[in-house]
Amino acid sequence: MSGTKLEDSPPCRNWSSAPELNETQEPFLNPTDYDDEEFLRYLWREYLHPKEYEWVLIAGYIIVFVVALIGNVLVCVAVWKNHHMRTVTNYFIVNLSLADVLVTITCLPATLVVDITETWFFGQSLCKVIPYLQTVSVSVSVLTLSCIALDRWYAICHPLMFKSTAKRARNSIVIIWIVSCIIMIPQAIVMECSTMLPGLANKTTLFTVCDERWGGEIYPKMYHICFFLVTYMAPLCLMVLAYLQIFRKLWCRQIPGTSSVVQRKWKPLQPVSQPRGPGQQTKSRISAVAAEIKQIRARRKTARMLMVVLLVFAICYLPISILNVLKRVFGMFTHTEDRETVYAWFTFSHWLVYANSAANPIIYNFLSGKFREEFKAAFSCCCLGVHHRQEDRLARGRTSTESRKSLTTQISNFDNISKLSEQVLLTSMSTLPAANGAGQLQNW
């Protein structure tokens, strides 16, 4: 999670190094033994052209890209269109979606290219910009999840200590982005491009890597330890503690401000005097209990959804966080004989990071009724838009036929109405009393 290499959270650069390739691939020892064009063809065939399992990886990245982009945009649109959804929690969810959109657009394509080709094709400027934006989005996601947990903890466990408002939520979001942009500046400073094939640097950009360049060995270790603690371990521990207390309050204890009746599994209230009919006081007490039950259920649904979001985040970022620490702090994988296995681990870890961005909208869809309704409405509008032209053509084609049928129906209905009127009149006449029958017929 600390940069943009394959060792970094959603890294956007190559984890391989020249010593690794030299120890595992003989052709790199003596590239002068090959003609330049022949050597480049060999590199393309052996390293750059996607293998069978890499096509599966490409398909997985495409699916994640589409789901993450469409899903998170729908989340933002749903909250923007509906005023009743502009709650404090939903403001933070929108901010989380914006961070996911940022990392999906700016970093996912570059990571896929680097994972497949092991080459940074995007130049020195983007070598600094893309890793910086990626780490900023990671920091924004972590801080946003922390603010959500803190807000829910105050609202449920200590409702009288702090009152959260939409204005405070918006101010917190601005602070989150400012802090994230500032603390990730070192990541942009240390990123540099270098080539692993100096002899062919003027002829090809193959095996150009975008990696960190530090002045000493102690600095990268300190940086990555701090990055791991600040952006993963410490926030995760605090959020777990907060949600544990929330779980105890919502599922095991009485929520402050609720009655003991609700706490006792919502047993029905019994009036003291047992009146024959429900009195006004009893009705008001029952209404209050019903409101408390509704509030508890709503809080439980929200807490359950946020706990799942946190759990998925922790699972998706755990592999890359561990691999980064092992690589950067302990120097593992620098000289490895099983290069393909290490490459597979890092590649899968990168995909997991982006899969987290795609998973969040899916979680909202399954665990939030309001978001589910908005997603259905959005897809319904899309489907109606696709079939709108076909329906217009069919409607125009049926116009003449329907008009002819309408004319025939009107004539038929006119005849039927006339016959029905005659039948009703005759029936009413036949049911008249005998004494008045002659007079009625005469008057008619």
From Swiss-Prot:
Membrane-spanning intervals of the chain: 55-75, 89-110, 128-150, 171-191, 223-243, 305-326, 343-366
**Cytoplasmic side stretches:** 76-88, 151-170, 244-304, 367-444
User: Which Cys-Cys disulphide bridges does the record give?
Assistant: C127-C210
A GO MF annotation of the entry reads:
orexin receptor activity
Sites carrying sugar chains? N14, N22, N202
Ranges for region Disordered: 1-30
Biased composition, class Polar residues, residue ranges:
14-27
A Pfam family matched by this chain, by name? Orexin_rec2
**UniProt topology in membrane:** Multi-pass membrane protein
Residue numbers on the Extracellular membrane side: 1-54, 111-127, 192-222, 327-342
Compartments (UniProt record) = Cell membrane
Instruction: Please tell me one Gene Ontology term that the record gives under cellular component.
Output: plasma membrane
InterPro entries attached here? GPCR_Rhodpsn (IPR000276), GPCR_Rhodpsn_7TM (IPR017452), Orexin_rcpt (IPR000204), Orexin_rcpt_2 (IPR004060)
Example GO BP: phospholipase C-activating G protein-coupled receptor signaling pathway
Region of interest: Required for response to orexin-A? 33-49
Q: Which UniProt keywords apply?
A: Cell membrane, Disulfide bond, G-protein coupled receptor, Glycoprotein, Membrane, Receptor, Transducer, Transmembrane, Transmembrane helix
Look up the domain of life of the source: Eukaryota
Skewed-composition ranges (Basic and acidic residues): 1-10
At what residues does the UniProt record annotate the site feature described as Important for responses to orexin?
Answer: W44
**What role is this protein assigned?**
Nonselective, high-affinity receptor for both orexin-A and orexin-B neuropeptides. Triggers an increase in cytoplasmic Ca(2+) levels in response to orexin-A binding.
Q: Which family does it belong to?
A: Belongs to the G-protein coupled receptor 1 family.
UniProt cross-references to PANTHER family, sorted A to Z: G PROTEIN-COUPLED RECEPTOR 15-LIKE, LEUCOKININ RECEPTOR-RELATED
Entry remark concerning the domains of this protein: The N-terminal region is required for orexin signaling.
What name does the UniProt record give this protein?
Orexin receptor type 2
Q: Tell me what organism the protein belongs to.
A: Sus scrofa (Pig)
Encoding gene per record: HCRTR2
